[in-house]
Each structure stands twice: as structure tokens, then as C-alpha cells.
Amino acid sequence: MRPAHAEPSRSCRRRTAGPADHDLRGRCLHERWRTGGIQERAAHGHARDRCAGTIDRPLLVYLFDPYCPWSYGYLPALTHLLDAVRDEADVEVVTIGLHDGTRIDQAPAPMRAVQRATGVGFGPGYRRALAEGEMQLRSRDAAAAVIGMTAADPGRVPDVLWAVHRAFFWAGRSLSDGATVAQTAQRLGLDGAAIEVFASSSRAAQMAEEDFHLARDLGARRGPTLLVSHGDRLCELEGPGTSGQHLVEQFRGVLARP
């Protein structure tokens, strides 16, 4: 059995119709159902336009956790891929729910291993928070923030992921803190106050739980997983340690298969 953050198997499987099928489109994942206005969602507690999208394009599904150091390390390669295929594929981010109140000193990042494999660095704020050991990691709160930011600007998924990861792994800020969420959103040019309100709502918590359930159905592990849904195939691309160009080549290979 390979380690949680080792190179994925790059496996592909055919999806057949049936009650147990991981049919992403059937679960409205592919149709960008999170594109309702943040302020309206915060006020009314529901998502709009759940099924308004393009179903003929391949779908990249990224399973990750904002508090996962290997997800942070995967970002350079993932960003390269998303930039390269932005006109060819839709993208959906699904959070996996890694932590539920874990203290930061009980989940220290393997900083040397991540930096050696991926090149990302860890900032003084994160190191200080780790040394203090008091922060509690609640993935549900972090997921709600990600959902709010990606819904506010669906075309900037890489920017949102970088901003959220760096808020924690560089600045050492808690993603359960409303001020952190608002400031992170504002730096992206988004309405920080509205996103803070949404992220603290019961609807955001419900949507985060929906993510966690979907991630489990899709076989999420404790590290990042990148899937391509194309036709009747669901394929896994390589994980942390690979290059962005290699991900592009793998993606094109999936599309080229009969």
C-alpha cells in the first residue's frame, strides 16, 4: 500500500450507469452549480443555477484540503495545468475534510519533504503558529471559505487556492477566522465582507459537508487527488512531485484514448 502522499496510480476506470456510479454530471458537479451570487446566497441560504454549464467538455476534479501541506505543494504543477487547458476543460474543486478540530501541533507539515518534492516554502507565520501549537484546524470552515471565493469568481480557481493556502502555510492564519477569510478575499479583489458572511452561514457548512461526502465517494485520500472525467472514463493524474508539463501530457493522453 503506497503512502498517502506518494505518486498516484494514474488509474482509469470506466463508469457505468447505476446507483453506485460516480457520475459527476449526474450530481451537478460539472454544471458549475456554485455560480450564484455570494450576497444572495448568504441572504437566502441556497445556491442558484445548479445545472447551467457545458457537459461536452472534459472535467478536472481536484480533491484537496486547505490545511493539507501536500495540496499546497501540488499547486505549482496544478496551476500550470489549469492555465494550459483553461479553454479545453471545466474545473471543479472538492474539499475532503481532513481535520475537525485537530491542533496544529498534532498535524505538523513535513516541511522539508514538501519543499524538496515541490519547491514551495513555508513562511514565518506558519512556523510561529506551529511552535505555539494552539490553533485548531477545522476543515469545514476552510472549505466554506473556498466555496465562497470560487463561487464569487469561478475563473480564478488557482488564485483562490494560492491565496487560501498561503494564508495558512505562509502567514499562519486560521481559516476559521472571519477576518482572515475577508482579508484573503479582498486581496483577490472580491467582496470580503459578503464572503465572510457566507462562509459563516449554515448553508456554507452544509455545502462543505456535501463536498466531504462526494470526496469520499470519489475515493479521496489524505492528500490531493486530481481526476479527469471524460466520456465514460474517470482517470487519476499524478500527484505531488510531478511537473505541470507532465500533468498536461497526461491530460492530453486521457483525451486521446478511444
Question: What residues fall within each predicted segment?
Answer:
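C-terminal cap of thioredoxin/glutaredoxin-like
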Residues: F64-Y67, L75-D83, A163-P258
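Active-site donor-binding loop signature of nucleotide-sugar glycosyltransferases
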Residues: P3, I96, G239
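Secretory/periplasmic and organellar redox-cofactor proteins
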Residues: L29, R34-G53, A205, F212, ...
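Extreme N-terminal starter segment of soluble prokaryotic enzymes
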Residues: D56-L60
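Short, well-ordered coil/turn elements that cap or connect secondary structure elements
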Residues: P3, I55, R86-E88
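Rieske [2Fe-2S] iron-sulfur-binding domain
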Residues: M1-E40
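Short cysteine clusters
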Residues: A4, C68-S71
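Structural alpha/beta surface segment adjacent to cysteine/selenocysteine redox centers
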Residues: Y72-F169
